Amino acid sequence: MKEIEIIKPDDWHVHFRDNEILNAVVPETTRHFARSIVMPNLIPPILNAKQAIEYRKRIEKAIPKSDHFQPLMTIYLTEETNKYELKDAYNSGAVFAVKLYPAGATTNSDSGVKDIKKVMPILEMMAEIGMPLLIHGEVTDKEIDIFDREKIFIDQKLDFICNTLPELKITLEHITTSEAVSYVKEANKNLGASITPHHLALNRNDIFVGGIKPHNYCLPILKREVHRQSIVQAAISGNNKFFLGTDTAPHLKEHKENSCGCAGVFNASYCISILAQIFENYESLDNLEKFTSINGALHYQIPRNTKKIILKKENEPILFKTSISVGPSNIVVFNPNFPVFWNVKN
């Protein structure tokens, strides 16, 4: 097989940041994707419709004229969020979903939720109007091992939300464990999960073996190979509960390569090529389109895209650019630990 055609993909989890970084990274996503859910964890975070609309306008200015792209905006959930303002924001079309960050779980999440029960009235309202809840599924207790934070969040927090509000549309984002895969499979139809290309490609050895690899450091952190295999099987299965959310997360090189480096992998540039290679390696190319282009739209109950893209398999591995420029600095581009032969044709 030399070429395949798929429905133009969607990225159901993207970080565009702001200002110079935003202008540099937006075209890397809009080249290959039709829609993206945009994360709200800026400094300061996106807390209301007015801020979301202003942020969307900044994103739209950075989209190349040749690309047709729709940013889907989110609001950062806090214990002070006004549920009536949130309802108006959703009903007006200004906001697509709400993001729940446990306080301190990841980049710019200090304003997040400390007590799930305090936001339950907001979640009840969201269930009533059909507004999706996006969850960074990790506990943040300092005594909890970082490799166990997703599993414990599912047991202690997610299960409570799902059982209390089974009608709430929930996405457990960037899953990394076999426990997450099993929980999502067994849950009702309103719970889905996004999976990133770097969690499909790497395990925790890829951070530590042969020296620290700061550009493979992300949150949730990479897990054991057995967990990677579990999420790969979920992604390639065609099961419509699992879909692509790249969690592409740009940081300047100097903010990654230091004594306390930032968490995040910038994977937008070659995401689709990497996924095609992974699916081919597992003899599952027939399910690539479901994962990248169909399952997410089904979960969010919106129409799938009408445009298509063509992927071509080259005779030699494609050459990845190492970085993209941002002013005097740059952002390192994710490159997996295997050859990639698939190219997206323009």
PLM regions and their residue ranges:
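Short, acidic/polar
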Residues: 19-26, 80-91
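Histidine/acidic residue-rich metal-binding segments in metalloenzymes
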Residues: 84-100, 108-244
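Histidine-centered catalytic micro-motifs
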Residues: 8-19, 133-139, 195, 246-248
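Mid-to-C-terminal alpha-helical segments outside catalytic/metal-binding sites
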Residues: 272-346
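Short helix-capping segments at alpha-helix termini
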Residues: 60-68, 163-167, 188-189, 283-284
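His/Asp/Glu-enriched, well-ordered alpha-helical/loop segment
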Residues: 163, 235-304
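Divalent metal-dependent hydrolysis catalytic cores, especially in the metallo-beta-lactamase
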Residues: 11-12, 25-50, 66-78, 94-108, ...
